[in-house]
């Protein structure tokens, strides 16, 4: 008996690395030291920092993976994976430097996971970070046929004096919401339950979606905010805080960027939720509170600025081709999310 008979195909692993090598190297920045295949990835800290702070984050894509696997469409999941990590570290004011991935599967299918890496490469290019390395684990008996899981890890850098940590936020600051591209990568256990309870398949094309399948609609990749937010930070607009709207929606995530003695007040109707959220609420009979506490509702990222810079910030995002709205205000409080109907 050998390792292959036990379910681990070393040759498939070599084929996979061969397939992705050129793509991975296309993401390399000048600071990358060496190629792929070593025991560790090496990255030189960029020059020009007086007191550099490294910022790290890790995340996954959750059960959105189930949709990709059902549709046999894997090229966008990698974008989601990068987005979930780099958008998180972006909230500190950090520039993403490099990314690493962990892929695990029951049987390594080189073409399938190469498609996942294609998305990871695209996400890295959108965020300007290098795909420095990764791990692919073949675990027979652990995952079903065609199943895999994915996790990502991002590291960024910010000048210590420019680090956003809540201390810059002031009472009266306004919250500017930047549009999401769709559901992003949170709430998919509920999405899947709604689809299943209505007896639909992911390949179904419903009239209201103009010929797109349900799978295509819900596999829309998470928007990566790195380039517009990095441009905003360099524009002269004084950003006081930022939040990435992920699991738990606005109520869970907005308070995370506040300082001591502060709460955030958000006004209903101050932005227009994307049609997909109204559709989910209707087809799943999900009440407004559950929708607010589960999904981003069309808000993927929020920046806090002074009232004096409100219009300049809105104009900036408009110039970037992004829809933005003032949705709330920082008030005195104990870290609460206050919803105004």
From Swiss-Prot:
Name where it's found.
Cytoplasm
Q: What GO molecular functions are on record for this protein?
A: ATP binding; phosphoribosylamine-glycine ligase activity; phosphoribosylformylglycinamidine cyclo-ligase activity
Q: Which NCBIfam families match?
A: purM
Protein name, as recorded: Phosphoribosylformylglycinamidine cyclo-ligase
Pathway the protein takes part in = Purine metabolism; IMP biosynthesis via de novo pathway; 5-amino-1-(5-phospho-D-ribosyl)imidazole from N(2)-formyl-N(1)-(5-phospho-D-ribosyl)glycinamide: step 2/2
InterPro entries, A to Z? PurM-like_C_dom, PurM-like_C_sf, PurM-like_N, PurM-like_N_sf, PurM_cligase
Q: For this protein, what reaction is catalysed?
A: 2-formamido-N(1)-(5-O-phospho-beta-D-ribosyl)acetamidine + ATP = 5-amino-1-(5-phospho-beta-D-ribosyl)imidazole + ADP + phosphate + H(+)
Q: In which domain of life is the source organism classified?
A: Bacteria
Q: What is its EC number?
A: 6.3.3.1
The UniProt family comment states:
Belongs to the AIR synthase family.
Q: What is its main location?
A: cytoplasm
What are the recorded Gene Ontology BP terms?
'de novo' IMP biosynthetic process; adenine biosynthetic process; purine nucleotide biosynthetic process
Which HAMAP family does its entry note?
AIRS (MF_00741)
Q: Which Gene3D superfamilies match?
A: PurM-like C-terminal domain, PurM-like, N-terminal domain
- Per the record's keyword annotation, is Transferase included, yes or no? no
Q: Which keywords does this Swiss-Prot/TrEMBL entry list? A: ATP-binding, Cytoplasm, Ligase, Nucleotide-binding, Purine biosynthesis
Got a GO cellular component term for this one?
cytosol
């Amino acid at each position: 008996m050998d390792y292959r008979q036990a379910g681990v195909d070393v040759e498939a692993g070599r084929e996979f690395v061969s397939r992705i090598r050129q793509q991975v190297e296309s993401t390399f920045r000048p600071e990358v030291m060496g190629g792929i295949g070593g025991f560790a990835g090496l990255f030189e800290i960029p020059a020009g920092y007086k007191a550099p702070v490294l910022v790290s984050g890790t995340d996954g894509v959750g059960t959105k993976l189930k949709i990709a696997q059902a549709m046999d469409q894997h090229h966008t999941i990698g974008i989601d994976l990068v987005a979930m990590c780099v958008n998180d570290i972006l909230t500190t004011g950090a520039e993403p430097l490099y990314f690493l991935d962990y892929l695990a599967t029951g049987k390594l299918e080189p073409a399938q996971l190469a498609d996942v890496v294609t998305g990871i490469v695209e996400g890295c290019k959108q965020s300007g970070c290098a795909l420095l390395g990764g791990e692919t684990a073949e675990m027979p008996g652990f995952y079903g046929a065609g199943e895999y899981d994915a996790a990502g890890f991002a590291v960024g850098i910010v000048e210590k004096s420019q680090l956003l940590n809540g201390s810059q936020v002031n009472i009266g600051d306004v919250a500017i919401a930047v549009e999401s591209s769709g559901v992003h990568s949170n709430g998919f256990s509920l999405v899947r339950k709604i689809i299943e309870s209505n007896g639909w398949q992911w390949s179904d094309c419903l009239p209201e979606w103009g010929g797109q399948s349900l799978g295509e609609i819900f596999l829309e990749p998470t928007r990566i905010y790195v380039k517009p937010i990095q441009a905003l930070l360099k524009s002269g607009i004084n950003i006081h805080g930022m939040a990435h709207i992920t699991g738990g929606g606005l109520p869970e995530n907005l308070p995370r960027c506040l300082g001591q003695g502060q709460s955030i007040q958000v006004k209903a109707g101050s932005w227009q939720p994307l049609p997909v959220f109204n559709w989910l609420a209707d087809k799943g009979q999900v009440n407004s509170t559950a929708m607010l506490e589960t999904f981003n509702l069309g808000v993927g990222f929020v920046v806090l600025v002074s009232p004096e810079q409100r219009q300049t910030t809105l104009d900036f995002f408009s110039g970037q081709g992004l829809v933005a709205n003032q949705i709330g205000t920082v008030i005195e409080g104990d870290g609460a999310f206050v919803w105004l109907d």
